[in-house]
């Protein structure tokens, strides 16, 4: 954070990393069920510059769009329709928290967004969680602008409440990774409880309380277990895949499979959590492979395409070279991941991926906050 002296205006800069799911996909949308999620070394940055006339919202993703906003009392009010609904809601939630903490929110500012998570010039999305990162970075910047103390957990909670107010689906594991950085073990909160609390409690009261079923635990770095990420060139639509799963689940007359899937996924993820803590590489490899097999079984029963032909090739080539691999996130496109214990193996996989038209993304695990 940069504060300019005297009558000079305040400038704040905040960044949030992208994410990749390592294990636990689909099951983690259920409260209390776990996933391993990594923050990765590409970032979305939000800059706030104090102004005295009219506020603006801008982004390198939409360079021709400038949204003006003003105040109604202390409340943020955008002028007209615009593509920044997530950003607007994040500002509203963060500023409500600031006011409930005893501070005023009369200031005007220009908020600008720059992102490394997508390739705006070529119109390419890599599936690195830009929607979660923009909410996290915006909330961090607004809290810093008003000199309101923050923790990673507070930023996570405010970001989740932002998404719930927009009826967003998903586990919010991307938000956990962007808020905490590094690698985390994550179980999702009970969204029904939070939605009920939003009807009759203040934002600050909700954030100050413990959240049912939520757990976020940082996991240690594993220098001898390197993450390698391949991008297939296909774009996955996470929300659509989750909705399809929900519809299928609702019409299932026998939910025994789904219950068993949740049980198996939770056991695999807990095993990975313990293996990360003890740096047990063979157990980590076994867990990644087990999760891949479970997700493929889940996809077959739920009539989903999680592991596309390109993702299957990505995983199989990694496995043929002795690495463990799987899809990352909802599947159906975007990225696959593998973990390699040595440089020779990594180079062999990268070469074979390139021959199969799979692009290696130069990513590493982002620093924990």
Which residues does each PLM region occupy?
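Short glycine/threonine-rich catalytic loop with a Thr-x-Gly-x-Asp
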Residues: 128-130, 324-330
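Short Gly/Ser/Thr- and Asp/Glu-enriched loop/turn motifs at secondary-structure junctions
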Residues: 106-108, 329-334
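C-terminal nucleotide
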Residues: 2-23, 27-29, 37-105, 118-121, ...
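DPxDG-like acidic metal-binding loop motif
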Residues: 126-149
């Amino acid at each position: 954070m940069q504060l300019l002296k005297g009558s000079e205006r305040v400038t704040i800069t905040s960044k949030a990393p992208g994410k990749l799911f390592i294990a636990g996909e689909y099951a983690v949308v259920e409260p209390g069920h776990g996933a391993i999620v990594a923050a990765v070394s590409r970032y979305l940055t939000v800059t706030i510059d104090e102004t005295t006339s009219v506020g603006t919202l801008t982004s390198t993703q939409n360079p021709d769009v400038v949204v003006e906003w003003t105040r109604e009392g202390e409340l943020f009010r955008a002028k007209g329709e615009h593509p920044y609904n997530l950003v607007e809601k994040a500002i509203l939630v963060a500023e409500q928290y600031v006011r409930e903490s005893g501070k005023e929110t009369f200031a005007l500012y220009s908020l600008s967004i720059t992102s490394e998570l997508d390739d705006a010039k070529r119109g390419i999305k890599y599936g690195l969680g830009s929607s979660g990162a923009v909410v996290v970075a915006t909330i961090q910047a607004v809290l810093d602008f008003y000199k309101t103390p923050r923790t990673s957990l507070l930023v996570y909670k405010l970001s989740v409440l932002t998404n719930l107010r927009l009826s967003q689906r998903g586990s919010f594991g991307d938000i956990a990774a962007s808020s905490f950085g590094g690698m985390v073990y994550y179980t999702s909160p009970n969204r029904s409880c939070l939605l009920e609390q939003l009807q009759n409690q203040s934002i600050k009261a909700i954030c100050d309380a413990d959240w049912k079923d939520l757990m976020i635990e940082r996991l240690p770095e594993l220098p001898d277990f390197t993450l390698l990420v391949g991008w297939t060139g296909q774009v996955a639509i996470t929300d659509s895949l989750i909705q399809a799963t929900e519809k299928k689940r609702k019409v299932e007359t026998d939910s025994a499979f789904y219950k068993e899937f949740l049980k198996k996924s939770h056991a695999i993820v807990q095993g990975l959590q313990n293996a990360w803590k003890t740096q047990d590489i063979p157990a980590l490899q076994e867990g990644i492979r087990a999760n891949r097999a479970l997700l493929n079984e889940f996809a077959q029963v739920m009539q989903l395409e999680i592991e596309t032909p390109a993702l299957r090739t990505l995983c199989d080539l990694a496995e043929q070279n002795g690495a463990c691999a799987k899809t990352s996130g909802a599947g159906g496109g975007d990225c696959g991941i593998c973990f390699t214990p040595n440089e020779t193996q990594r180079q062999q996989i990268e070469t074979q991926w390139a021959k199969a038209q799979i692009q290696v993304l130069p990513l590493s695990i982002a620093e924990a906050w």
